[in-house]
Amino acid sequence: MKKNTLFLILLIFVIFCFIVLFKGLSKDNSYKPNINFGKKLSSFEGKNFFNDQLINSNELFSENKIYVLNIWASWCAPCRAEHSILMELKKNKVIEIIGINYKDNLKNAKKFVDEYGNPYSEILIDEDGTIAISLGAYGIPETIVVDRNQIILKKFFGAINNKSLKEINSLTK
């Protein structure tokens, strides 16, 4: 009798654990941080990738174009995967792509750009991650699309793909 009661309690506990585990695994865990679409981008500044000149973000958004800010690093595998998409996006003359090189070894980053091509009109160095933090980045790669007034139109988490390319290009029409 005692053995049966102990077995029943253990069985109920195991079933309860499976139910809790199943509920937890079936929850949607695709967390999307609050993006302030329609809000102005925080201003930032960083050193130019090629000449170390300090650039304020307000200097970058002067023409009547769509601006794509891409946070990347040479050590980031998804950044490598999306690079061909950025090269394709560069062909759209109404779009300027601004690269934010995140916590990277400058020598490796320059080698990456030389080897794979440079889709960026400007590249800023983000040595300590402060630019990415000010932009609300949660990881890399991340891509933020803004208009000339620095209003956030779209944000992509992770590597952009052909679908993202179409979405960004559609913003120019």
Question: Where do the model's predicted regions map?
Answer:
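Short, Lys/Arg-enriched, disordered terminal segments
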Residues: 1-7, 28-33, 58-59, 91-92, ...
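N-terminal targeting signals for export/organelle localization
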Residues: 1-47
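Conserved redox-active cysteine motifs that mediate thiol-disulfide chemistry
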Residues: 71-88
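A short beta-strand-turn-helix
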Residues: 43-67
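Hydrophobic beta-strand anchors of alpha/beta hydrolase catalytic cores
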Residues: 68-69, 97, 143
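Thiol/disulfide oxidoreductase modules built on the thioredoxin-like
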Residues: 114-119, 126-172
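Short pre-active-site segment immediately N-terminal to redox-active cysteine/selenocysteine motifs
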Residues: 65-67, 71-75, 139
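Conserved segment of the thioredoxin-like fold in thiol-based oxidoreductases
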Residues: 91-92, 96-128, 140
